[in-house]
């Protein structure tokens, strides 16, 4: 994992440059190209920003994630989990209502063309948060349980090595530990004592506290404890060895996340803040360049030939006399269309970069990925719109 941390920085920097900085900077050149008589049709710009670039980013991200070493797969929290109710109807209602509200506010406060961007980003983000919240709660409980597992196994292993029965050692661990792990072992100890069942049944039997915990680490520890209950005192050293391995793994993961913090932090900040900020400001700059460039060309045309400027020019047109004469070859790209394309691209970046950042840091945990995307989308949307308005006031 340490080698992966060093190897990933270069590819992530390249992805950052060619997937974010250069494409967003190129947006400002589009009105200049149109004013110079070389307009790019909307279909070409949309194809590049909404198909080609996202496809390349997804491929690069998948390549990076495939190289990440994984000691344990992340928890898989399915819809059949008893603590995960079906929130899809609630998510749809909340998503639609927030999308409508965000669209109206955006149309009134920013621009009519920005309403679809505002509605999509805020609405989808809100729907994802509502839909994934129960799974996020379960995931937090699983993570807390796993974090205390090395301590619990150390207590049990030490007691078993001294000749204490596994069942009593489990109950003792439950009494000495706090939090989710202590509760898990305490409940298993009570079940074993009350129902007179074996260790495996106490943990993962019908109604067992670990039965619905979707953690390979927890279930692996339970399997070892069940073997220790059969083998007796000699198995204590094996349990202690597992506890040491879990502790080393926890330290390794903590250290790797700390080393990856710069890379993953940059990706997360770019997804939610930097890319939308640059995108909104660049679209505002493109608007100003469009107005200044087209008016300048028309003035030169009028001064040189005595002809009046074409009535087809305007702030949202990206038009020029040369473009008009070549209108049959390529329709110029209006600012509203450009703003929608760039806005959609920033939302796509929010999804892709947030997924990549989370995958590099935690492994591709679907619950955590969806949860963070649900936060990143509204944040990116608001940042994009505010940047457009603020930059427009400056320019």
Which residue stretches match the model-derived regions?
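Hydrophobic alpha-helical membrane segments of integral membrane proteins
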Residues: 170, 238, 369-370
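Glycine- and small-hydrophobic-enriched helix-loop-helix hairpins
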Residues: 1, 149-234, 388-395
């Amino acid at each position: 994992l340490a080698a992966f941390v060093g190897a990933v920085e270069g590819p992530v920097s390249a992805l950052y440059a060619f997937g974010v900085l250069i494409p967003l900077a190129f947006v400002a050149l589009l009105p200049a190209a149109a004013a110079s008589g070389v307009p790019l049709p909307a279909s070409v710009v949309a194809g590049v920003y909404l198909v080609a670039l996202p496809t390349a980013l997804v491929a690069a991200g998948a390549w990076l994630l495939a190289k990440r070493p994984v000691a344990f797969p992340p928890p898989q929290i399915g819809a059949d989990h008893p603590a995960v109710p079906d929130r899809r109807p609630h998510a749809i209602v909340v998503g639609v209502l927030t999308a409508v509200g965000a669209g109206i506010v955006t149309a009134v406060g920013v621009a009519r063309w920005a309403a679809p961007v505002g509605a999509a980003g805020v609405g989808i983000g809100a729907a994802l948060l509502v839909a994934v919240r129960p799974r996020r709660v379960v995931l937090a409980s699983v993570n807390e349980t796993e974090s205390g597992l090395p301590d619990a196994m150390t207590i049990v292993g030490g007691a078993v090595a001294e000749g204490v029965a596994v069942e009593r050692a489990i109950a003792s661990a439950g009494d000495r530990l706090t939090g989710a792990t202590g509760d898990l072992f305490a409940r298993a100890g009570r079940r074993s004592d009350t129902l007179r069942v074996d260790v495996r049944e106490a943990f993962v039997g019908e109604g067992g506290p670990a039965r619905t915990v979707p953690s390979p680490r927890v279930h692996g520890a339970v399997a070892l404890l069940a073997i220790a209950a059969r083998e007796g005192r000699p198995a204590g050293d094996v349990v202690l060895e597992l506890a040491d391995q879990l502790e080393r793994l926890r330290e390794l993961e903590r250290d790797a996340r700390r080393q990856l913090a710069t890379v993953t932090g940059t990706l997360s900040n770019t997804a939610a803040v930097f890319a939308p900020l640059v995108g909104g400001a660049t679209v505002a700059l493109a608007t100003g360049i469009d107005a200044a460039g087209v008016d300048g060309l028309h003035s030169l045309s009028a001064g040189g030939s005595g002809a009046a400027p074409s009535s087809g020019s305007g702030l949202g047109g990206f038009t020029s006399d040369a473009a008009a004469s070549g209108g049959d070859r390529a329709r110029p790209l209006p600012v509203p269309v450009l703003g929608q394309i760039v806005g959609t691209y920033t939302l796509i970046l929010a999804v892709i970069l947030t997924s990549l950042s989370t995958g590099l840091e935690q492994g591709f945990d679907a619950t955590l990925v969806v949860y963070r995307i649900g936060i990143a989308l509204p944040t990116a949307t608001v940042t994009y719109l505010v940047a457009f308005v603020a930059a427009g006031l400056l320019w």
